[in-house]
């Protein structure tokens, strides 16, 4: 099966959030199943020096009133084909932000549609988040291409209807309120990045004002859990941590713990309970809860806390103040360092994720891979990946709390600290979480089933019927001219017009 991924990120070249991990790791897992999988993304300025990109493009075209070119290169790790959309609007180091962000990604979606119709035609075009939300709108009338849309974070929804009309001349009834809504309506299949998140977004609490539409399309909505690259994140072979270890020999984890304490300026003590947090410092991630409970928790226990990340100024200020007041026990590193993040995963005893909402979460999977026990709020993908630990039966993977309240987080942290004092059962818990399968191979099988389902769909969905009702029929004379043109040239180059209808060049 020919599958084209369209996304704004692809790890390791471009990674801002979890979407980059998915687009970088899922395609090779699908390729292992025999699919021809390729990725198309904007040609950001930094990519031309990172990748071996030929000077000549493989294809040139025009859309939204401007020329663009598509260059073919290879993924540096997997060797899969990567297509870069070249245009001056993507020059420079910027990935997101700027006054022209809406135009940039709407243009990318438009260019991708042109490329999929006329250059390399996939059977499935897999779109990711609002940046590619207009692709299903423009593709919905092509019976040869099925579209899948993945929701990584429903909170970010793209440009609104009035702006899309100005940029694309696409009428309001083909858009929804914004690009996210348009994709939800027109994509043949929609998936969220965890089963629980797929259910949560259908409620007012997590639906970001789209719960009505999500309930309407629930027949084509599903949740598929993300995975991790188990080869790149393997404590038994990781050359970027001070000592390797495995379930057969955990002694290397103590070496990593000592190295972490030394690196972060903490008091070196192998018996101290160390909690790590690696995250964007935003309200979604629950950092405000940590600041509310840290002082009391440090006073009650001999715990040390390590935080790595960057984000909102008020949260950074609070973490800096906490580190100043509790030197040697609370350390915050207000930037992002990949090597240090690995050391935190390997050297901590527990990993904190008190998220307000969490579509899937990758950090808790990485922490368990390194034998670090997660302390999480039961929300989104954290529900699917971290069942509560029950000491009496030795079941579960971590310590959980339900309400977004400081007292609930405090109670979960105390339970983790008390469990750590019973080292025999704690060691069993470490070994168990290290053996859980969170590989992309497992997730790829679920995506494979979804792709086969959408390509085998013979009857249109109710949503497709509703969309077809808005299609504008051609006058009889145009239909006759089109039939004559098709008889003369059965394989024309096709383009989309602002109404989302397929047409011929010059037609």
UniProtKB/Swiss-Prot annotation:
Per the record, the similarity remark reads: Belongs to the glycosyltransferase 1 family. Bacterial/plant glycogen synthase subfamily.
**HAMAP family documented for this protein:** Glycogen_synth (MF_00484)
Binding-site residues for ADP-alpha-D-glucose, renumbered to this chain? 15
The record, for Pfam families, names: Glyco_transf_5 (PF08323), Glycos_transf_1 (PF00534)
Name the chemical reaction catalysed here. [(1->4)-alpha-D-glucosyl](n) + ADP-alpha-D-glucose = [(1->4)-alpha-D-glucosyl](n+1) + ADP + H(+)
Name this protein carries in UniProt: Glycogen synthase
Taxonomy, top ranks, is: Bacteria, Bacillati, Cyanobacteriota, Cyanophyceae, Synechococcales
Known EC number(s)? 2.4.1.21
Q: Which SUPFAM superfamilies match?
A: UDP-Glycosyltransferase/glycogen phosphorylase
Q: Which NCBIfam families match?
A: glgA, PRK00654.1-3
Q: Which UniProt keywords apply?
A: Glycogen biosynthesis, Glycosyltransferase, Transferase
């Amino acid at each position: 099966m020919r599958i084209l991924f369209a996304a704004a990120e692809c790890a390791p070249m471009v990674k801002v959030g979890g979407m980059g991990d998915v687009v970088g790791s899922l395609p090779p897992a699908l390729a292992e199943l025999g699919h021809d999988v390729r990725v198309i993304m904007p040609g950001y300025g930094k990519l031309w020096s990172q990748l071996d990109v030929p000077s000549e493009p493989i294809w040139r075209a025009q859309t939204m009133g401007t020329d663009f070119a598509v260059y073919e290169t290879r993924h540096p790790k997997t060797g899969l084909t990567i297509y870069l959309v070249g245009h001056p609007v993507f020059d420079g180091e910027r990935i997101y932000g700027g006054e022209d962000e809406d135009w940039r990604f709407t243009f990318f979606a438009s260019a991708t549609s042109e490329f999929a119709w006329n250059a390399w035609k996939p059977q499935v075009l897999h779109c990711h988040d609002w940046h590619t939300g207009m692709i299903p709108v423009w593709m919905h009338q092509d019976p040869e291409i099925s579209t899948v849309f993945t929701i990584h974070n429903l909170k970010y929804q793209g440009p609104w209807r009035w702006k899309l009309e100005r940029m694309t001349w696409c009428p309001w009834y083909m858009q929804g309120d914004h690009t996210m809504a348009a994709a939800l309506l027109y994509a043949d299949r929609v998936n969220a990045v965890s089963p629980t998140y797929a259910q949560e977004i259908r409620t007012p609490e997590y639906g970001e004002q789209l719960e009505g539409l999500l309930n309407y399309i629930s027949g084509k909505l599903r949740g598929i859990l993300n995975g991790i690259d188990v080869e790149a994140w393997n404590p038994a072979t990781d050359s970027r941590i001070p000592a390797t270890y495995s379930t057969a020999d955990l002694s290397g984890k103590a070496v990593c713990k000592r190295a972490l304490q030394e690196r972060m300026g903490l008091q070196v003590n192998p018996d101290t309970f160390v909690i790590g947090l690696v995250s964007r410092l935003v309200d979604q991630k629950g950092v405000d809860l940590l600041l509310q409970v840290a002082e009391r928790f440090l006073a009650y226990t001999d715990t040390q806390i390590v935080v790595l990340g960057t984000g909102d100024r008020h949260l950074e200020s609070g973490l800096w103040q906490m580190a100043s007041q509790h030197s040697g026990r609370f350390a915050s590193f207000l930037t992002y360092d990949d090597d240090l993040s690995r050391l935190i995963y390997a050297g901590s005893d527990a990993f904190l994720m008190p998220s307000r909402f969490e579509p899937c979460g990758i950090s808790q999977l990485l922490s368990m891979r390194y034998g670090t026990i997660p302390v999480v709020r039961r929300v989104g993908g954290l529900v699917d990946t971290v069942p509560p630990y029950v000491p009496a039966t030795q079941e579960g993977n971590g310590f959980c709390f339900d309400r977004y309240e400081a007292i609930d987080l405090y109670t979960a942290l105390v339970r983790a600290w008390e469990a750590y004092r019973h080292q025999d059962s704690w060691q069993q818990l470490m070994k168990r979480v290290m053996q859980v399968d969170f590989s992309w191979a497992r997730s790829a099988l679920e995506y494979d089933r979804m792709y086969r389902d959408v390509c085998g769909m013979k009857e249109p969905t109710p949503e497709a019927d509703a969309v077809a009702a808005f299609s504008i029929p051609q006058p009889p004379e145009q239909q006759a001219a089109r039939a004559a043109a098709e008889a003369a040239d059965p394989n024309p180059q096709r383009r989309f017009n602002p109404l989302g209808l397929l047409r011929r060049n010059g037609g």
